[in-house]
């Protein structure tokens, strides 16, 4: 799901600073409103059916299951759940005390409505394998799949349940659910204000109001430095410059950044919307493999993240379904040059750029212009690629522009999930051209077959060899030893400035930044100063 970091004009920052000046924030032990600047304003609003909360924590809604701090699967709305012997039907018992802010009870009928509506919407939430969800009682639910799907638990733990009676065209702008918070106001591009749901069944929030301020990174930093915000997400390059009265917080993540390559040549094909498909340079395997061989990822960590991160070699480094043998480790320019030479790339005119069949080894790399970390990574890749004769032109664009260009140009994307299902969405042929998933139109039947075997496995543990085979089975795979569909670069640490008085509790290993991951346990946060 694409989320935007809207620009917040200097004048708006100043005006907001007057409302939440250091004097007003520090005049009492706890601020009247907890102010957070964590980015990630959802362009499409707060509707789980269109993708809100797909990386967890829908804030306003409850999910059937959830992942606890240690990433164990536990109940949220569900108090019990079983899977049938044929692994196609989930039966769940729901809690009876889940209520909307107006006191309306949330029932199994609402849950069934949510799943069936998301299936029919055919959007970001992939429920194509769902046959039917049905309420078998006020608080009992059956979810029947067409085929076994071992990763369906990730849907159970991420899809927020919407109330059937309150759901309509304006729901995304006026969300309501049985989650810990309710919407008070959303001024798009500026701020979101929430208050506790008085009927929330979990830990009672420690703050009567929370304001999320949206804006540029510079604006967020200014809010922290003037004392107008109590928690701010900051780029790794700034995190060590902690303002007085705040502390730095580094959270481990599976949030990665990498270069997606268009995998088919330019034949003039276009999407149904008229956007071009294909790139005749990046579709050459030698180009993709050579870049993976050449890139010094630790240098990129040091350059773009000030050392606050680790190299990335695949989409799931260190997770149980990762295949560490699927990828080259990089930093080997000689191997990269040999790969290019074997692929027929030569510098015939001495300009430092390789050619093949009259075409330069040159392409454009897009990145979101509002993201300084992705810009730094892009520029680092550009410089390293020069050393092996590949010319990359960096272009910072809006997400709206990237959407129209991403099937024909390389893009510096970010992903990272607690589920191996994301590997399918990034590399499965059935997702080719499906929004931001597989925009490069990658298609490898052996990879698809491995994914199918993983999903049909009898247990999660039994699925692991198949996830790993999709990356590299000794002959092929989407990893850099195989088709090199991506050049993964870095795994981030999520970095924050946090008020010395704010206790945010234990944090999960966080997924990709979309969906306010730091706020997963927002209801547990407490003000510690007296």
Regions found by a protein language model. Give the residues of each.
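Detector for C-terminal structural segments
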Residues: 28-29, 187-191, 196, 256, ...
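N-terminal lobe/hinge region of extracytoplasmic solute-binding protein
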Residues: 35-85, 116, 176
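Ligand-site clamp/hinge motif
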Residues: 197-244, 391-393
